[in-house]
């Protein structure tokens, strides 16, 4: 239910002088040297932390291009800039600067220039910049923003995807223009945008500039709107075709049948390479010699959280085999070894992302086990990996890891000065026996300046998905350190249904939304209070988003043990949620059918049907543009609470979707959330 591969880290540069002035005054009064000062994370600190993402290695493997994002409350938007750093180290240098936001850096095959997307001229366009110096050159004149940017192997052209009006002539009455939308099919909106009269298509354009040519002029979205990989548009090594992920079903709202198509650059008909699999295929990745195409596949149609297998297709014979047939874990981002004898895969395991080496005969070896590692990139000699690494007390930065020795070296340290002033504790692991008599794992973060002799309130964070997990990361939105900073112990339990603990564990939540996870969460509180004497079991609050928001509603109707609750974009009534969500395969899998074919399960697990039990004070957050869990879910819950006299507060964002991402709105979000916790947990 949470959007995959879309979490963005947001930050802003607040005035350093403005932040340090009150600290300076207080520390002078205490006669403490300013240089020794450390303080708990504040919102201004949080929004001021830069974010590192999207590392791209140069063709010779010597240099990493990457994106640094900073956010501004004044501008209420993020600004991306592209930076370069040598793999052997050195000071990173900024490649792009100016008023625009620059992203998607992609090296030309000869390594002499970088293509990227920028809105410096107004609408986002493709630009090229030479590594030898000079200004960036605009290479496109598009009406809508390009995405999925990639170079042809000969460096002469670029492929990308972009939204277009579809059909080209909608036949609207223009005598008296209106904003009316008319549709006949499902998937009329997705995530946070309306898709009526819009399609995403794949284009190719000369690197020298000119008109873009549509390679997919059909009534489908290329690449797919949902459940894609980190790469869903890529050239074949000979440059004659593009591999594109798309769902060609007549009604993509009810199925997960993404396929990988070979789309000829000359405009001839595409070939479906994965037609035999009715489930999700994505993320095509060719070996440079052209013999192999690796990709990811799920095998159960309609189940978005099925185990993701690593597949290998022989491009000569057409034979396909599964390299991970007997594994319980899912394969994330993948990359080829330089000798084409193995692939490397990012794999979520026990609340962290590790890196496995998987040979073409299916043998597996964990080669990076430390830390939480994303976006792996391999050096040309195959000896090292560049990764984006983060932890609950460490925002993302670039690291290079030598595979033979495990030696690590930091390549970027974009928040070094800011972090030196902050007091943040690392996440600690814990586990207990939960539902089905199975081990359940969690993370705990202590407040800054922790004193084991004190008693602290507990803030219990519940993840969405529900097939997801709370991981050891510096979360862009539900940041553990922000919750801990006012003086709370923060705990997260990866209940039955969570990812990273084997597919059987993940599967267990489907059709069991209110029993196994709820049992885990209640036993988790029992374990925490019994195990950690510094937790005050009489002052416990809980907060969750999406499925986590659903669980908050469920908890509110099942127990009175919490002092206060916070639900963000939660499901209150599963039956009415079905009629307003866009990806219908999700509730149909989770509840075993539609509301008219399996209504009993929708009724059984809907908190709305137990509204008479509501009594715990609750803060509800919901936004107008949330098309995953419609705004009406939050309104129904608020009505049920207030009609029965239960203290409640509603925070509404007219310009946000399932996530609150705009800088100023995030400020409001944190003010309200922390204020609610303080009101009920600090008494």
What are these regions (language model features)?
Residues 479, 484-485, 492-683:
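Active-site-proximal cap/loop segments of hydrolase catalytic domains
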Residues 455, 466-480, 495, 632-633:
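The serine-hydrolase catalytic nucleophile loop
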Residues 56, 159-161, 168, 179-184, ...:
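Non-catalytic accessory segments flanking enzyme active sites
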Residues 61-64, 111-115, 155-159, 239-243, ...:
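Hydrophobic beta-strand positions that form the internal "hydrophobic ladder"
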Residues 86-90, 130-134, 206-210, 264-268, ...:
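Short loop/turn segments that connect beta-strands within beta-propeller blades
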């Amino acid at each position: 239910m949470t959007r995959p591969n879309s979490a963005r880290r947001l930050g802003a540069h607040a005035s350093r002088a403005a932040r340090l002035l009150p600290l300076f005054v207080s520390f002078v009064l205490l006669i403490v040297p300013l240089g020794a000062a450390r303080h708990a994370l504040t919102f201004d600190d949080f929004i001021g932390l830069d974010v590192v993402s999207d590392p791209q290695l140069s063709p010779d493997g010597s240099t990493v291009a990457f994106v640094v994002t900073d956010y501004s409350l004044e501008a209420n938007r993020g600004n991306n800039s592209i930076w370069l750093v040598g793999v052997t180290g050195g000071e990173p240098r900024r490649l792009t600067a100016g008023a625009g936001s620059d992203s998607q850096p992609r090296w030309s095959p000869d390594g002499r220039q970088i293509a990227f997307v920028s809105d410096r001229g107004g609408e986002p366009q493709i630009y090229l910049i030479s590594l030898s110096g000079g200004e960036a050159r605009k290479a496109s004149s598009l009406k809508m923003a390009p995405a999925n940017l990639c170079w042809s192997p000969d460096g002469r052209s670029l492929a990308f995807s972009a939204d277009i009006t579809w059909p080209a002539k909608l036949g609207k009455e223009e005598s008296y223009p209106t904003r009316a939308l008319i549709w006949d099919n499902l998937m009329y909106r997705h995530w946070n945008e309306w898709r009526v009269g819009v399609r995403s298509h794949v284009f190719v354009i000369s690197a020298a500039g000119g008109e873009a040519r549509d390679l997919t002029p059909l009534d489908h979205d290329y690449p797919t709107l949902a459940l894609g990989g980190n790469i869903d548009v890529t050239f074949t090594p000979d440059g004659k075709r593009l591999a594109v992920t798309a769902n060609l079903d007549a009604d993509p709202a009810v199925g997960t049948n993404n396929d990988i198509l070979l789309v000829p650059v000359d405009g001839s008909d595409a070939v479906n390479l994965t037609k035999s699999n009715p489930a999700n295929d994505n993320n095509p990745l060719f070996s440079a010699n052209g013999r192999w195409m690796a990709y990811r596949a799920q095998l159960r149609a309609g189940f978005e959280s099925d185990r993701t297998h690593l597949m290998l297709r022989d491009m000569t014979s057409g034979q396909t085999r599964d390299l991970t047939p007997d594994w319980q874990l899912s394969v994330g981002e993948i990359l080829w070894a330089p000798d084409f004898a193995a692939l490397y895969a990012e794999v979520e395991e026990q609340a962290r992302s590790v890196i496995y080496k998987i040979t073409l005969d299916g043998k597996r070896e964990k080669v990076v086990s430390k830390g939480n590692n994303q976006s792996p990139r391999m050096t040309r000699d195959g000896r090292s990996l560049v990764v984006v690494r983060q932890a609950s007390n460490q925002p993302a930065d670039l690291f290079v890891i030598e595979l033979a020795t495990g030696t690590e070296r930091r390549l970027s340290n974009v928040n070094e000065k800011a972090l030196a002033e902050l007091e943040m504790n690392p996440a600690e692991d814990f586990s207990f026996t939960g539902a089905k008599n199975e081990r359940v794992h969690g993370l705990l973060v202590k407040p800054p300046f922790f004193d084991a002799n004190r008693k602290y309130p507990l803030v219990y964070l519940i993840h969405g998905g529900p097939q997801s997990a709370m991981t050891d990361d510096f979360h862009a939105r539900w940041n553990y350190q922000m919750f801990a900073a006012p003086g709370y112990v923060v705990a997260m339990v990866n209940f039955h249904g969570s990812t990273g603990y084997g597919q059987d564990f993940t599967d267990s939540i489907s059709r069991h939304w209110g029993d196994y996870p709820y049992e885990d969460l209640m036993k988790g509180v029992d374990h925490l209070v019994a195990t950690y004497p510094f937790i005050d079991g009489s002052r416990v609050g809980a907060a969750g988003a999406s499925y986590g928001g659903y669980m908050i509603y469920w908890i509110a109707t099942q127990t009175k043990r919490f002092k206060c609750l916070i639900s963000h974009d939660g499901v209150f009534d599963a039956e009415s949620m079905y009629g307003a969500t866009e990806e219908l395969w999700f509730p149909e899998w989770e509840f075993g059918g539609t509301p008219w074919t399996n209504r009993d399960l929708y009724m059984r697990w809907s908190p709305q049907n137990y509204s008479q039990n509501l009594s715990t004070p609750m803060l509800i957050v919901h936004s107008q543009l949330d098309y995953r869990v419609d705004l009406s879910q939050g309104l129904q819950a608020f009505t049920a609470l207030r009609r029965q006299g239960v203290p409640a507060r509603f925070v509404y964002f007219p310009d946000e979707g399932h996530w609150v991402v705009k800088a100023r709105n995030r400020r409001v979000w944190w003010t309200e959330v922390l204020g609610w916790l303080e009101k009920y947990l600090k008494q």
